């Protein structure tokens, strides 16, 4: 039996297997607690896709970073998005980057997230659909979709915290061009 404190190494960041297991279990628990129809199909997708394994581009690069980032976004939204149902916060916070598990197809990862959820038969409210599908869309006024505003703030907060904790992984190395 593998030791659960075995370390996984990627790009200079250690993540314990126990941490990854805890993150997976916590996310599944939160999602099941929503009681939303179709949630088990989405959870099965998460468990069989790269959602719990992959990192993000530009932040949370470590193995399991995507799930960790999504959990951080959810937790931030839970404390700052007052007035929204807990199930909407869970769906938006935990599924906003789901599209990063799918092959690129010309759409942004937010829109791919919505497509995946649609294919799995998971129903979204109009506001959830807009928040997830357009969370990086600068052309959409943040005031027209308050849930998207909360998602964008939480997404930026999680990313900034990771970059602050791992500055050595955020430098862009530029090649010196000779003239």
Model-based region annotation:
Residues 1-179:
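Metal-dependent phosphohydrolase cores
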């Amino acid at each position: 039996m593998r030791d659960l404190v075995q370390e996984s190494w990627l790009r200079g960041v250690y993540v314990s297997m126990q941490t990854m297991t805890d993150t997976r279990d916590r996310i599944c628990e939160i999602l099941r607690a929503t009681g939303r129809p179709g949630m088990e199909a989405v959870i099965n997708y998460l468990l069989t896709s790269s959602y719990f394994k992959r990192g993000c581009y530009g932040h949370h690069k470590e193995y399991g970073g995507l799930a960790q980032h999504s959990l951080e976004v959810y937790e931030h939204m839970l404390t700052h998005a007052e007035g929204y149902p807990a199930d909407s916060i869970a769906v938006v916070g935990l599924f906003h980057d789901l599209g990063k598990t799918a092959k690129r197809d010309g759409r942004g990862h937010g829109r791919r997230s919505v497509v995946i959820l649609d294919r799995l038969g998971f129903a979204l409210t109009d506001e959830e659909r807009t928040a997830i599908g357009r969370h990086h869309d600068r052309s959409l006024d943040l005031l027209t979709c308050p849930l998207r505003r909360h998602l964008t703030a939480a997404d930026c907060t999680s990313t900034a915290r990771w970059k602050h904790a791992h500055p050595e992984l955020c430098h862009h190395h530029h090649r010196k061009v000779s003239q």
